[in-house]
Amino acid sequence: MGHARPRPKLLASKLFIIRQELGLSQVQIAKRLGIQEYTNVSKYERDINEPTLMIVLAYARLAEIPVEYLIDDRLDLPL
């Protein structure tokens, strides 16, 4: 049957760093990402909820970085 896929351990902190580097509040980044509930941003940043692939891609686009930097724990953000 299915196997659990490994989750990036550093994703939450990278999402937080991106928001901070862009100088955006949680409400502001939620609007730019098309997230209805800004509280989800906090949950992503605290590793309570895992963002969807579409949200991860939107973060990468907003930060103008390849998505690999978000999902590969071996890579540091190029910010």
Model-based region annotation:
Residues 23-43:
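Short alpha-helical DNA-recognition segment
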Residues 53-56:
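Long, hydrophobic alpha-helical segments
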Residues 9, 20-21, 50:
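Short amphipathic helical patch at the helix-1/turn junction of helix-turn-helix
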Residues 1-5, 20, 43, 61, ...:
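Short, charged recognition helix plus adjacent turn
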Residues 36, 51, 62:
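Residue-level signal for short amphipathic helical patches enriched in basic/charged
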Residues 12-16:
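Short C-terminal alpha-helical element
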